[in-house]
Swiss-Prot record:
Entry's localization field: Cytoplasm
Region (G2): 60-64
EC supergroup of this enzyme: hydrolase
Pfam families registered for this protein in UniProt: GTP_EFTU, GTP_EFTU_D2, GTP_EFTU_D3
Gene3D superfamilies the UniProt entry points to: P-loop containing nucleotide triphosphate hydrolases, Translation factors
InterPro entries attached to this UniProt entry: EF-Tu_GTP-bd, EF-Tu_GTPase, EFTu-like_2, EFTU_2, G_TR_CS, P-loop_NTPase, Small_GTP-bd, T_Tr_GTP-bd_dom
Molecular function terms, GO-annotated: GTP binding; GTPase activity; translation elongation factor activity
Name of the protein this chain belongs to: Elongation factor Tu
Residues annotated to bind Mg(2+): 26
GO cellular component: cytoplasm
Amino acid sequence: MAKQNFVRSKPHINVGAIGHVDHGKTTLTAALTMYGAKKHGGKVMNYDDIDNAPEEKERGITINTRHVEYESAARHYAHVDCPGHADYVKNMITGAAQMDGAILLVAADSGPEPQTREHILLAKQVGVANLVIFLNKMDLADPELVELVEMEVRDLLNLYGFDGEKTPFIRGSAFAAMSKPDDPAATKCLDELLDTMDKYFVIPERALDKPFLMPIEDVFSISGRGTVVTGAIAQGKVKVGDTVEIVGIKPTQTTVVTGVEMFNKLLDAGQAGDNIGALLRGIEKNQVERGQVLAAPKSITPHTNFKATIYCLSKEEGGRHNPFFSGYRPQFYFRTTDVTGTVTLPEGKQMVMPGDNTELVVELITPMDKGSRFA
């Protein structure tokens, strides 16, 4: 059967669900796709469709980020379901780095947990502009304690640089909304959530006029067709027939885009902000990997050495407990990958304490492109 074309009838925005493990992120994601499909059309994704890796099903948690789509009255949403488990923080960073806004889930019956704090901090660090808070599991919560939970979350938002007083809070039960899609009382919270997202999440200005650039998040081999790379386009546009380069980590390769899709629908052209899959001519799956970028020819040059001005987060800000010295080899998170680098401090600087500002030189073990943000 021929694939449908993707029709741009509404503004597109990238959002996602973050928060502590088992606070209901995947359940809410499934509920939103069901509700959006019922009201505005689209594909229903149930819980098992989203939690679809064997290890995830076995452990009942989300490991890699999952992309789904749904619509509100005003917008088309690409939604990433982020893992909450502590072992998978770098996957959470991969998802959060693509978000224009995020839904932070907090279970009303238990309140903020360790990963709640961590995800708020990470969202701030990777540049998520705004959060909407969904107080979940209201059907299990003590009504007298819910106000205290909300106050505690607002304090956390203020602590990590968000506006705790102005951030919207929605109360509901994602499980009830998913289980009773025809019950207006159960789905009222989804109506409120989508309406709030439409009003509160600002669609950023997309860099459409810059050279095409897309960090590669995943790589697939499709029998009979070739290799597909997926990711969110950071800037520019791409269409079938465009020549592109695969840059970073390995020697640069040149290829041609032979197909562009978004959510299994054909795209005339992918543009900044779109989550796409690009089919590449003559590239084997083992020749490309997550962490590389797809880019317009000659538009970027990878580097292994750079100078940076940094602030070292203190223990209270979710950062280091101890100082570090020249020769320290941390992980640098760039877009969709992490790269080890060796730190050299300026002459006369013996060490960097938590809370310090300093300049330093970094030598990466694999090259990255100039201007890349890192955490």
